[in-house]
């Protein structure tokens, strides 16, 4: 009797085991078929792109049409991305290889994340999953200056930020968020706001109350004075560094000012430079103040990196009316937000690369280029400021971070 029961149990166990193995096998086969269908779909979509746009040449040979030359597209799928490589062989399709962003994006139904170009090919990288949009609260939890989940940079690497965008582009909101992020690393802040607007009243006055020094500068003469003082501070820092080589040289490398314990960055934010120019040019004295200010701004852009002084300039349009070409080339980070991305001239003035199919963006979205980090302009969504955010509490927290860093050296709020 015991033998029969044991046999029955073993038999039932075997049946159950075979059942689950069969289910697993069918699921695996189904997954493989779906994966193959997906890959075939990519291949088909790329072939359709080539044929429908006639990116090929053909000849009739022995009454049959044969392909003699075509744009070569290769692709590779990774866990997170689809990479499409447009090959460059020096033929008639060579220049076309770098202008396929919009077509490939439509063919794959994915947003273009990044484009890189070499002598032999242009690589288009399409993330398979949408990048998580950060909130203002998220950005105070990072040591880097952060724009999105995958886009950020360390202070000074590279230095200086040029931010452009029309009205209702989200430019001022991003400036406010960047100010909070700079406070988060202990930076001293100077806000140069010729419009005497939101940046002054919502952020500047709050910082003056909490930090205990002058933050807001509005008139052309105040702005010129702030830039003059920044250049003076830069030169003082350089002199201190020169007088103390043992402190500022380590392992054959010259340290920046803020690399040394007890030293902190200085950040100059100039919002709406055209408004500064317009107001300054109403008087002779104002014109002189403006010329001095622009000279000092140029000095800071060229020389201040080692002194840990950073400049952020906000504009509606990065035209040479305010920012000459030689100045624009010294901004390591360039951001263009909102509907301005539909203006090719604005894109050309902001970014070094012109081989991008820029799309028209909404509030808080646009393109970014970072020297040494993101070589080609990339679509981004800036940190989201919700209606429920307690603005006062948020900047209190940013100021608390500022004082927490400085308290390590015996300073106090």
Predicted regions and their residues:
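P-loop NTPase catalytic phosphate-binding loop
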Residues: 1-34, 81, 133-243, 266-267, ...
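Phosphate-binding and hydrolysis-coupling loops of NTP-dependent motor/remodeling domains
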Residues: 61-90, 103, 109-127, 337-413
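A generic structural signal for short, non-catalytic loop/turn and secondary-structure boundary residues
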Residues: 156, 261, 330, 361, ...
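Intrinsic-disorder detector for long, low-complexity, phosphorylation-rich regulatory segments
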Residues: 247-250
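Generic recognition of flexible, low-complexity loop/linker segments
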Residues: 253-258, 299-300
């Amino acid at each position: 009797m015991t033998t029969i029961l044991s046999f029955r149990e073993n038999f039932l166990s075997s049946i159950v085991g075979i059942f689950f193995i069969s289910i697993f096998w069918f699921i695996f086969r189904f997954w493989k078929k779906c994966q193959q269908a997906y890959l075939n779909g990519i291949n088909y979509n790329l072939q359709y792109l080539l044929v429908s746009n006639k990116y090929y040449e053909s000849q009739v040979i022995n009454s049959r049409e044969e392909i003699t030359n075509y744009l070569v597209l290769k692709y590779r799928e990774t866990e997170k991305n689809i990479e499409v490589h447009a090959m460059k062989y020096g033929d008639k399709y060579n220049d076309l290889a770098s202008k396929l962003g919009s077509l490939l994006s439509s063919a794959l139904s994915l947003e273009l994340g990044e484009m890189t170009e070499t002598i032999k090919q242009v690589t288009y990288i399409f993330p398979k999953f949408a990048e998580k949009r950060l909130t203002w609260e998220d950005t105070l939890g990072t040591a880097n200056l952060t724009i999105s989940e995958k886009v950020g940079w360390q202070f000074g690497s590279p230095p200086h930020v040029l931010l452009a965008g029309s009205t209702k582009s989200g430019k001022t909101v991003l400036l406010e968020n960047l100010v909070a992020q700079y406070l988060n690393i202990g930076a001293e802040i100077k806000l140069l706001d010729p419009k005497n607007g939101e940046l002054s009243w919502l952020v500047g006055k709050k910082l003056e109350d909490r930090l205990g020094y002058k933050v807001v500068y509005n008139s052309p003469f105040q702005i010129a004075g702030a830039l003059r003082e920044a250049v003076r501070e830069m030169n003082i820092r350089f002199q201190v560094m020169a007088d103390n080589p043992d402190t500022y040289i380590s392992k054959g490398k010259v340290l920046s000012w803020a690399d040394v314990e007890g030293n902190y960055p200085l950040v100059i934010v100039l919002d709406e430079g055209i408004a500064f120019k317009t107001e300054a040019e109403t008087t002779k004295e104002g014109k002189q103040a403006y010329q001095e200010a622009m000279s000092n701004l140029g000095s800071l852009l060229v020389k201040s990196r080692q002194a840990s002084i950073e400049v952020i300039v906000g504009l509606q349009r990065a035209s040479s009316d305010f920012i000459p070409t030689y100045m624009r080339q010294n901004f390591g980070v360039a951001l263009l937000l909102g509907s301005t991305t539909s203006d090719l001239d604005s894109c050309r003035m902001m970014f070094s690369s012109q081989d991008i199919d820029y799309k028209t963006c909404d509030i808080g979205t646009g393109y970014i280029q970072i020297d040494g980090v993101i070589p080609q302009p990339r679509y981004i969504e800036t940190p989201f400021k919700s209606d429920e955010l307690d603005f006062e509490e948020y900047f209190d927290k940013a100021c608390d971070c500022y004082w927490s860093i400085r308290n390590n050296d015996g300073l106090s709020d």
